[in-house]
Amino acid sequence: MSEYGKAGSGGLQSSQYDNIDRRERQKQLVLEHVDVSKDPYIISNHIGSFECRLCLTVHNNVGNYLAHTQGKKHQTHLARRAAKEQRENPSVSKNNYIQTTRVIHKKTIKIGRPGYKIIKQRDSKTGQLSLLFQIDYPEIESGLQPRHRIMSAFEQRVEQPNKDYQYLLFAAEPYETIAFKIPNKEIDRTTGPDGKFFTHWDRNKTFTLQLYFKE
């Protein structure tokens, strides 16, 4: 697991359509990678909203719920729940987690980790820290696009949880999923021409993701 180390122009109408399309692609990537049906804390109520059983909060849609799961309140409750379960059942180890992931991916023969490059920058105007990830997937399966997900330190079972960090995961068959350890700070998810969150999948089979942390 590694620690971390706007382009274009055009008419207003074209820019607006590009902005909408990009937001939809980002939303779809998240929904494809995160199976909320396996989340023990989400329930749908009688008015079509979604509730978090862990934090007793209500959310208008799945996207809002997923954003909530990355927040401080949910992460704090997860940490407390994990500590309680560890005390009550100390025999559960990370080996169980590893076995589970192997079963999930047993139909695909992994070919190793993809190559990658990370660029660390700061916005000259706002002072915000930026991380740019470029992941190469030359042998990605036909018709697929890479997926990404941000995971809290208390969801993973590879390292001892540290509340100061979170993990950015990239996945694409038949490559192994790779994870980067990044600061546990709120990510600026503004989009659009001046947005601070950007993803791109190009014809050279390089997946690019750039994010900024809020100050």
UniProtKB/Swiss-Prot annotation:
**Disulphide bridges, residue numbers:** none
Is S-adenosyl-L-methionine included in the keywords of this UniProt record? Answer: no
The alphabetical list of record keywords is: Metal-binding, mRNA processing, mRNA splicing, Nucleus, Spliceosome, Zinc, Zinc-finger
Q: How does it assemble?
A: Component of splicing factor SF3A which associates with the splicing factor SF3B and a 12S RNA unit to form the mature 17S U2 small nuclear ribonucleoprotein complex (17S U2 snRNP). Identified in the spliceosome 'E' complex, a precursor of the spliceosome 'A' complex. Identified in the spliceosome 'A' and 'B' complexes. Identified in the spliceosome 'C' complex.
The name this protein carries in UniProt is Splicing factor 3A subunit 2
| One GO term describing the cellular component | U2-type precatalytic spliceosome
Query: Which SMART domains has this protein been placed in?
Result: CactinC_cactus, ZnF_U1
Q: What GO biological process terms are annotated to this protein in UniProt?
A: mRNA splicing, via spliceosome; spliceosomal complex assembly; U2-type prespliceosome assembly
Question: What organism does this protein naturally occur in?
Answer: Dictyostelium discoideum
* UniProt record similarity statement: Belongs to the SF3A2 family.
Query: Any idea what job this protein has?
Result: Involved in pre-mRNA splicing as a component of the splicing factor SF3A complex that contributes to the assembly of the 17S U2 snRNP, and the subsequent assembly of the pre-spliceosome 'E' complex and the pre-catalytic spliceosome 'A' complex. Involved in pre-mRNA splicing as a component of pre-catalytic spliceosome 'B' complexes, including the Bact complex.
